[in-house]
């Protein structure tokens, strides 16, 4: 393996030093500027052929200039820390405790970003880029807007990869797909009246009550199907002119996750069924508007099909060989993410897409998030070997 990749202990330590530095660089969604500049500087230091930050704030690095285009993507943004007092170390300290690096983003997903940056640079040093172009992106606002950042990158930079590797945490297990997602808003409409005379109005919350019951029943029904999806009411609110008035509008936010075999069109039918017979109800996609750290406007339409690449697909077979070359053994299993990623965009374009990244995804977003730094090194080895084989 050392002969194949030119891996050295010094290079591995430099990778971990950078990884810990990224954790120390706080990068909440829409606040990734410092992280982008840090990554940009490291790419330049490592000898990337081209490095830039695009209009939405994604940092983009390129090595090679061949016809086959390989893309490694990691998002730079992290969810917020609301409980720093509950962490065993400060959440942006990147301290090592019992061999584990602790900190927000240690799993989700600064290990994958660091490993892919160093892998692309190593591939260039080792002369593995003949006929290939490798892009590494640190993308923005993934935690809110799956894929929107990549859509901007591909369009603005006129890039269409042949292969995309999503470096989300998988505990360094080859991951063949993830669930789909539809996020929808249902509204009910009432008539405001004084709280002392509720019979003169129509309570929008009461209008919503039957719909909520139907949501619960739909989730139970989905659970009876092996490998079925889920639906959850994740937010509820109402509008009222005062606390002594009948609410004139009620709004619920639904998060529907789709497993392979389900589709977005099916969910649209489910939404219609939820409001069937309710004259004062409507539904729509939960479209989200965000502004990136550069001022770029992001519009997110949360409706994505589930996807899964075949075990015998050429990319899967190549990943399996890269795994065996890098680690001296065949992969024991494959994985499937039960959450969404930026893969939704390359998959929708027909790009061969697969997942692989360091860290246990069950620890993502959690208090005391942590990752084994050796797994970050291993991911770098895998990415480098994959570049060689593609």
Located regions from the model:
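Hydrophobic/aromatic beta-strand patches that form the interior of the parallel beta-sheet core
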Residues: 70-72, 137, 165, 279, ...
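Residue-level signal for inorganic ion chemistry
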Residues: 22, 26, 168, 208, ...
